[in-house]
UniProtKB/Swiss-Prot annotation:
Cleavable signal peptide: none
Enzyme class, spelled out: transferase
Upper lineage: Eukaryota, Metazoa, Chordata, Craniata, Vertebrata
Gene Ontology annotations for the cellular component aspect, listed alphabetically: cytosol
Name of the protein in its database record: N-acetylgalactosamine kinase
S-S bonds: none
Organism: Homo sapiens (Human)
EC id: 2.7.1.157
GO molecular-function terms, A-Z: ATP binding; galactokinase activity; N-acetylgalactosamine kinase activity
UniProt: alpha-D-galactose binding residues: 43, 49-50, 52, 190
Subunit structure: Monomer.
Amino acid sequence: MATESPATRRVQVAEHPRLLKLKEMFNSKFGSIPKFYVRAPGRVNIIGEHIDYCGYSVLPMAVEQDVLIAVEPVKTYALQLANTNPLYPDFSTSANNIQIDKTKPLWHNYFLCGLKGIQEHFGLSNLTGMNCLVDGNIPPSSGLSSSSALVCCAGLVTLTVLGRNLSKVELAEICAKSERYIGTEGGGMDQSISFLAEEGTAKLIEFSPLRATDVKLPSGAVFVIANSCVEMNKAATSHFNIRVMECRLAAKLLAKYKSLQWDKVLRLEEVQAKLGISLEEMLLVTEDALHPEPYNPEEICRCLGISLEELRTQILSPNTQDVLIFKLYQRAKHVYSEAARVLQFKKICEEAPENMVQLLGELMNQSHMSCRDMYECSCPELDQLVDICRKFGAQGSRLTGAGWGGCTVSMVPADKLPSFLANVHKAYYQRSDGSLAPEKQSLFATKPGGGALVLLEA
């Protein structure tokens, strides 16, 4: 249940090769044995892209890949972080002087986000120190939310070290808020599914208030992740934050057009809620109120009756101050149509008609087209990969995660899975230039996994 704390489970470490290896590496690194372990999963968003931060429901599931941290509280105030991957250097600092550098999305900063979120929630000035060894098997910058899984894992680590309790919902909200310390204006989907996920089911995640509903996926289909091998680091690019701002500006212009108090409006969902109309009707309002040609800052100011200075200081975020072009019509059209597709997807899953897989696949395909054409968050490699997946039997295929690289998710009839994997591997990954990542991490079927939990050695 969402109101419960994350589970604590006792395990025989010797029976779990990854845990055993982590324990041995921890002992080698710190000269002691971990007191406990925490795991938090990555996720794949099946449908509902770039709409969580606009206030709309999304439909993700946790993947089996996760971040796993071995932890030992210490009596000093020193925080020592190490990673099993040599690409990520060791880091140490005082637990009472947490500094997060927004300009550098270094791996340890994501841990610090989770720690700081819990510290601030409880208003603690003195935190106990800890030694932590991090191991992750979620491909980084792939759109499977490795960074948010690390934030969530660190939040639960800190909570456990403190001996405090919070519900899964509270933890998800704290971690979503604290990830913004690193400059990412996300909406909370990644953190919510990391805590609220349950094995065997996808979840409809709703916001304000945060809640999760089981969505039973079709039994005759398998979801396959395929990595384009184009890395996209969310916090290191302005693309993501520009989209957040375009949605905010679109919401304000739509509110002004409908004579609402626009200055209080931040999200596209708020406009719909205030007008009390359907998503389909909101698409018609968007057609009337906004034009397809890009807006410049001066035109936005004219529409809202404000100065450029007011636009910059009161509305734009620090990292969008210098943007000269805003595509408001396209972004609003994507958000309202994608929000409708999420609800249709859930409805089809509930009603389970005979042609369920075909109908769900069509929604996934429409979602990708909207991400590509209206939200412009795809890239040539993702489009090529989606085409290949559909060609070899996927009923639906789309980019998943922020986009601009990362992964696709495809819904494949279970009986076609072996030939699908073989053909996609041959068509996309077996290239003469040898520049792509190992296929094992890049192409795999997945089923809904469980959420974050604490592991104690039995």
